[in-house]
A protein has these predicted regions:
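Non-catalytic effector/regulatory segments
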Residues: 22, 32, 43, 52, ...
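Short, charged recognition helix plus adjacent turn
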Residues: 6, 12, 31, 49, ...
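Helix-turn-helix DNA-binding elements, focusing on the entry/boundary residues of the two helices
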Residues: 15, 26, 41-44
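Recognition helix of helix-turn-helix/homeodomain-like DNA-binding domains
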Residues: 24-38
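Short, basic-rich loop-to-helix N-cap that marks the start of a DNA-contacting helix
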Residues: 36-49
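Residues in the helix-turn-helix
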Residues: 17, 28, 57
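Short basic helix-loop element that most often maps to the first helix and adjoining turn
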Residues: 2-21
């Protein structure tokens, strides 16, 4: 899973613009943003460079979040 859509929204950047900068079709970038497809590591790195963000910002952690309510009950 990736956070491309969230970063684009936060920066006010359109998927069409990213597609042009990346040299990919709008449909491909849209599928990345919707998490229907995942970009290659190379493309993810290019996207991070284009958006001027750390590549980590585009990734979703696989670690489960701690349920704070559950921890409060214990």
């Amino acid at each position: 899973m990736n956070r491309i859509k969230e970063v684009l929204d936060r920066k006010g950047i359109k998927q069409v613009w990213l597609a042009e900068q990346l040299g990919k079709s709008y449909n491909m970038v849209h599928s990345y943003a919707q998490n229907k497809r995942q970009p290659s590591i190379d493309d993810l790195y290019k996207i991070a460079e284009i958006l001027n963000v750390d590549i980590k910002e585009l990734l979703v952690s696989n670690k489960p979040e701690q349920d704070t309510k559950w921890n409060q009950v214990k």
